[in-house]
Amino acid sequence: MDKFKEIRPIVLGIVKRDDKILVSKGYDKIKNETFYRSIGGGIEFLENSKEALKREFKEELNIDINVGDFLGISENIFTYNGRNAHELILFYNVEISDSNYKEKYHIIDDNCETDAMWINIDKFINKELKIYPE
C-alpha cells in the first residue's frame, strides 16, 4: 500500500536547551513553504515508540539520546508536496548530553538532505516561523 494512503504512526522528540528547541528544516515545493519539525520518524511494526525515537535520532543525527516523559499524542492530516498524508504522532521529552551538543546537525534521510538546528521557541509562538504539526 502507498505510504501516503495509510495512517502512519510516528514519534517526535522535543529537545529543549535554554529558550531553544531542536528542529529540522523542511520545504514543500508545491506550497513554496519552508517549515520546521521536531526530530523523529516512523515507528516500525513491533517496535515500541521509545526505541523508534532512539533509532531515528541515531540514524538522522548520529547521537544517542535519553527519552524522557511522554507528552501526548496528536493526529495530523495534511498535504505535503501535493500528496495527502495522515499521521498519529507520539511526543516525548528528549535529552541529549553536552558531549553530543552541536549548533547544527546535518541530516541525510531517505536520500534527502537538510539541517537540524536550535531555534528560539518564540519564533514559532509569534508565527515568525512555521512548525508542524501546529
Sequence positions of predicted segments:
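A generic fold-level signal
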Residues: 6-8, 16, 31, 84-87, ...
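Conserved Nudix-box catalytic region and its N-terminal flanking loop in Nudix hydrolases
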Residues: 20-59
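Short secondary-structure boundary/capping segments
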Residues: 3-5, 13, 28, 82, ...
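Charged phosphate-binding loop/patch that engages nucleotide di/tri-phosphates or the phosphate backbone
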Residues: 130-134
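Unchanged
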Residues: 43-66, 76-129
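Short, flexible active-site-adjacent loop segments at beta-strand->alpha-helix junctions, enriched
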Residues: 19, 27-28, 74-76, 96-98
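Conserved N-terminal beta-strand and adjoining loop/helix that marks the start
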Residues: 1-22, 42, 93
